[in-house]
Curated annotation (Swiss-Prot):
Protein name: Cytochrome c oxidase subunit 2
UniProt gene name: COII
Gene3D superfamilies reported for this sequence: 1.10.287.90, Cupredoxins - blue copper proteins
EC number: 7.1.1.9
InterPro entries: CcO_II (IPR045187), CcO_II-like_C (IPR002429), CcO_II_C (IPR034210), Copper_CuA (IPR001505), Cupredoxin (IPR008972), Cyt_c_oxidase_su2 (IPR014222), Cyt_c_oxidase_su2_TM_dom (IPR011759), Cyt_c_oxidase_su2_TM_sf (IPR036257)
Membrane topology summary: Multi-pass membrane protein
Known partners and oligomeric status: Component of the cytochrome c oxidase (complex IV, CIV), a multisubunit enzyme composed of a catalytic core of 3 subunits and several supernumerary subunits. The complex exists as a monomer or a dimer and forms supercomplexes (SCs) in the inner mitochondrial membrane with ubiquinol-cytochrome c oxidoreductase (cytochrome b-c1 complex, complex III, CIII).
Transmembrane regions listed in the UniProt entry: 27-48, 63-82
One Gene Ontology cellular component annotation held by this UniProt entry: mitochondrial inner membrane
Cofactors (names): Cu cation
Organism: Periplaneta americana (American cockroach)
Compartments, as annotated in UniProt: Mitochondrion inner membrane
GO biological process: ATP synthesis coupled electron transport
Length: 228
């Protein structure tokens, strides 16, 4: 999760988020280079008088400032399109989790197993202990196995919501009457935090998302416990 005064992105917990961080750094490097070149040219124009009465045209410079931006855009667009394809790709899922947004809590249904469904509410501040995070911890976490392809089916029961886990690079709009799906793989154990990312009413800020990533054996034991 994010930490106090953190200026960077959250640590990735999925291959997609790793690729998003790489693309962010790649695009930022190009932007910084453009900023340096443009800043140098502006400063040079201020402190130098480049005046040539005999210069009537500059076809080469016009050609250069037409081709150079096109090449730069290609260097940005190619990895971006590749990443969009990877994010939209759905592998054969081992576990399917249906997520339903409500005002103002989440419901989870494990469609592959019988009788495994529950609601997830934010824990009020007066019921928290010192190990919990304000406005982020919930009473029932969604438990998922790591190193396993997971499909999330997202919908809403009332208004627009958005199911978002930044450390997984996952954001899916929850629309009433419509099913959206995303696929991801969690590559490490831990507790992952997120929040609704769509303005959905007065208590929009109070419907956090908590995913607990555990081993496959631990997940099977949890499913057996939930079915008892």
């Amino acid at each position: 999760m994010t930490t106090w005064a953190n200026m960077n992105l959250q640590d990735s917990a999925s291959p997609i988020m790793e690729q998003l961080i790489y693309f962010h750094d790649h695009a930022l490097m190009i932007i910084i280079m453009i900023l340096m070149v443009v800043s140098y040219m502006m400063i040079a124009m201020v402190f130098n008088k480049y005046i040539n009465r005999f210069l009537l045209e500059g076809q080469m410079i016009e050609l250069a400032w037409t081709i150079a931006p096109a090449v730069i855009l290609i260097f940005i667009a190619v990895p971006s399109l590749r990443l969009l394809y990877l994010m939209d790709e759905i592998n054969t899922p081992t576990v399917t989790l249906k997520t339903i947004g409500h005002q103002w809590y989440w419901s989870y249904e494990y469609s592959d197993f019988a009788k495994v469904e529950f609601d997830s509410y934010m824990i009020p501040q007066d019921e928290m202990d010192h190990s919990m995070f304000r406005l982020l911890d919930v009473d029932n976490r969604a438990v998922l196995p790591m190193n396993t392809f997971i499909r999330i089916i997202v919908t809403a029961a009332d208004v627009l919501h958005s199911w978002t886990i930044p450390s997984l690079g996952v954001k899916a709009d929850a629309t009433p009457g419509r099913l959206n799906q995303v696929s991801f793989l969690i590559n490490r154990p831990g507790v992952l935090y997120g929040q609704c990312s769509e303005i959905c009413g007065a208590n929009h800020s109070f419907m956090p998302i908590v995913i607990e990533s555990i081993s496959t054996n631990g997940f099977i034991n949890w499913i057996l416990k939930m079915n008892m």
